[in-house]
Amino acid sequence: MDTKKYKNITRGVSDTYVNVHPIQRGGVLTAEARKALLEFGDGYSVCDYCFEARVDLVENPPVHDLVQDVAEFLNMDDVRFTAGCRHAKWAAMHMVCEPGDTVVVDALAHYTSYLAAEANKLNIVEVPHNGYPTFEVDIEGYARKFEEVEQKTGKLLSMAVLTHVDYRYGNVADAEKVGNICKEYGVPFLLNTAYSSGIMPVDGKKLHVYFLCGSGHKSWAASAPIGILATTYEWTSKVFNKSTLRGDWSGRGFTKKEIALFGCSPVFGAPVATLMASFPAVVERVKHWDEEVEKARYFVGELEKIEGFHQMGVKPKQHTLMNIESLPLHEIAEKDKRRGYFLYHELKKRKIVGLHPGMSKNFKINTYGLKWEQVKYVASAFKDIARENGIKVED
């Protein structure tokens, strides 16, 4: 066994590069979080003063205060930190639904929404989207699916899941409308905010959300893995239900431990410390979401000056994550010895990273948090690559 390769690992990308990775922009650490990462990087480092047997109750560092402040920030009543947004979805389904129940999801849902349902032995029914080129989810379809499920099974489904911002096209779904439909039918509503809360304003109660799931490492400037599960007072005791099991021989019990969180949320060190350190900046940055959307729209406008380039998804952009169709580049890549890696290497030569290697027919990109000059630089780089390869570009 050669273990030398594990030492001194690096990403191979310096701070001088512009990172446009679609799932990393909202998770870029603040300076305060980088400091906290070093301070709390050792294992269970936030548990030095744990007296209540749960990380969410730790007072020093102020994790318990953070729980309350995050709940207030999201306009929800109670919060727990989880091992990613996927764990939050699994936990809510596990505590609310029964095996064999049906949940409705949008057809753009992240794969982990499906796996969370499957792990809980639930059935899935999808609300469709309208296909190419906008891929817009049929929000009114939630009501139709509710009625179809009730007619087929004789009972209402046990949960409705909506992806607030999908990971493929960056479409922003009308969560408030789905929330109203769920309220009318009496169906518990889970909103996946992995790409929204933490970078844009999200008000859980305004949206009639019962369970709000977020991603600290995707959108709250935290190191991975950490998720957020927020709920209302009506559901707190059910979702965060405590253990009642006792050993038949020892009599041991763990009555403070919450079942769906495996007793204590597995975010004990760097994840919760970096989330905490970045939180003041997160609270501030959502106030500037309009400017982030403005940058995204500018970027789309510049790239669509390239012949054959089109933004897929709903227009105009409401979010910074976007999917660009780029068929002329794909045709060039087919003849280039680098094949699909052509675009990746051309951008890296210009110190731009984050596009998935091998993609040229279309690509996902995210401008969130970039300075205006960086947005303009990346747009210019694409136009330069196009011109160098004989693709027409509008002046």
Stretches with model-predicted labels:
Residues 98-156:
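PLP-dependent aminotransferase-like
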Residues 33-36, 40-95:
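Conserved N-terminal alpha-helix of the aminotransferase class I/II PLP-enzyme fold
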Residues 293, 297, 309-346, 369-371:
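Conserved PLP-binding catalytic core of the aspartate aminotransferase-like
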Residues 216-318:
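Active-site C-terminal subdomain of aminotransferase-like
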Residues 1, 147-148, 152-155, 284, ...:
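PLP-dependent enzyme catalytic core of the Aspartate aminotransferase-like
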Residues 203-217:
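Conserved active-site segment immediately N-terminal to the catalytic lysine
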Residues 135-198:
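Active-site phosphate-binding strand-loop segment of PLP-dependent enzymes
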Residues 1-53, 261, 369:
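N-terminal "arm"/small-domain region of PLP-dependent enzymes with the aminotransferase-like
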